[in-house]
Regions:
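Pre-Walker A (P-loop) beta-loop-beta motif of ABC nucleotide-binding domains
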Residues: 21-32
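The feature captures the beta-strand-to-loop junction immediately N-terminal to the Walker
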Residues: 34-36
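Helix-to-loop junction immediately C-terminal to a conserved catalytic motif
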Residues: 49
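Conserved coupling/switch loops of ABC nucleotide-binding domains, chiefly the family-specific signature
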Residues: 55-58, 214, 246
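Conserved ABC transporter NBD signature motif
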Residues: 57-69
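ABC ATPase nucleotide-binding domains
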Residues: 81-83, 87, 91-234
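Glycine/charge-rich catalytic "coupling/switch" loops of P-loop NTPases
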Residues: 228, 255-308, 332-357
Length: 357
């Protein structure tokens, strides 16, 4: 079930929180709204849910308008056939797991036998079948989150909206819940719109990421596409760690040279891009795309300033003529601060965009 937004605007008397937003969230996919606090992502979600009243624009769910200022349409939340999972879980502490999940079904007037069937089926789906009669206060944080998700799923909504539902969990539990949410989406073919400020969460969950800034979408696309080919400095810096440096790029044959005020260096080798010649650009190299070599030979000279061993990888800060570079290499490394090395990469691993963007 798709969601379409056309020229949506929302403000609270000051600067626009949502600024002329137009986009579409695909049916039977996970769309993640990503961005810092105050960028408009949660307000967008609440407008879709009917919990906020936009100033103007249009929202369609499966082609049917649920909000349109010109036609004076503004369906209440209960008429939009959607479910929502909040950051706070909103679990009733005096009820059992079964009673919490059954509450919205009873409110809709479903027969008791149907309520029982749906609740038991949904609890089995989220792995809580053995806890149906346990009190809500006896559950862990992850179990409470699964109850909130089960309560949403039990109503068989056409659309699931999730507002930072994993932010209160520890790192290990967040990773487990991300997998469970992806599995749940595949099993139910639900359309999910998920809000987060956590870039790792967005990358692992999303079919499509919508990166927000100041009430607008700066870039949208598959996680790998946005990570590898950001449109500007903001996107590059927000989604992962980024080494960005200016230079004049000269591609001749199969080598890329970067000329800077501090010298000229061969950084990358590979097939030259069609039509490329010398031009000014901002260069992006992700930390894991740098290759490190012993001192001597060609490449960008550098000195290790500091390093951190992170278990599966070692992260270095390397001082170079084009500024400090973050370098990530797999596993444990024997290098130490003060060691000299050379850095290079492949043309396919370097992304260029216009200066000042």
């Amino acid at each position: 079930m798709s969601v379409e937004i056309n020229k949506l605007n929302k403000s609270y008397g000051g600067p626009a929180v949502i600024d002329d937003l137009t986009t579409r969230f695909r049916s039977e996919a996970i769309s993640v709204l990503l961005g810092p606090s105050g960028c408009g992502k949660t307000t967008t979600l609440r407008c879709i849910a009917g919990l906020e009243h936009p100033n103007s624009g249009q929202i369609l769910i499966q082609g049917m308008p649920v909000f349109c200022d010109r036609q004076r349409i503004n369906l209440p939340p209960e008429k939009r056939d959607l479910g929502m999972v909040f950051q706070s879980y909103a679990i009733w502490p005096h009820m059992t797991v079964f009673e919490n999940v059954a509450l919205p079904l009873k409110a809709r007037g479903l027969p008791p036998a149907e309520v029982t069937r749906r609740v038991d089926e949904t609890l089995a789906l989220v792995g809580l079948g053995a806890m149906r009669d346990r009190g809500a206060t006896q559950l862990s944080g992850g179990q409470q989150q699964r109850v909130a998700i089960a309560r949403c799923v039990a109503s068989r909504p056409r659309l699931m909206l999730l507002d930072e539902p994993l932010s209160n969990l520890d790192a290990k539990l967040r990773a487990e819940m991300r997998k469970e949410l992806k599995d749940l989406q595949r099993l139910t073919n639900a359309t999910m719109v998920f809000v987060t400020h956590d870039q790792e969460e967005a990358m692992s969950l999303a079919d499509t990421i919508f990166l927000f800034r100041d009430g607008r979408i700066v870039q949208e696309g598959a996680p790998a596409d946005i990570y590898r080919k950001p449109v500007n400095h903001y996107v590059a810096g927000f989604l992962g760690k980024a080494n960005i440096f200016p230079g004049v790029i000269d591609i001749t044959g199969k080598a890329m040279e970067v000329r800077t005020a501090d010298g000229q260096f061969v950084l990358a080798r590979g097939a030259a891009l069609p039509g490329e010649s010398a031009r000014s650009a901002s260069c992006l190299v992700r930390p894991e795309y740098w290759c490190a070599h012993g001192d001597g030979g060609r490449g960008l000279p550098g000195t290790i300033e500091s390093l951190m061993f992170l278990g599966d990888r070692t992260e270095f800060i390397v001082t170079t003529p084009i500024g400090p570079q973050t370098v990530t290499l797999p596993g444990y490394r024997a290098e130490k601060p003060g060691d000299s090395l050379r850095l290079s990469t492949e043309l396919t691993q370097m992304h260029l965009f216009a200066p000042g963007t």
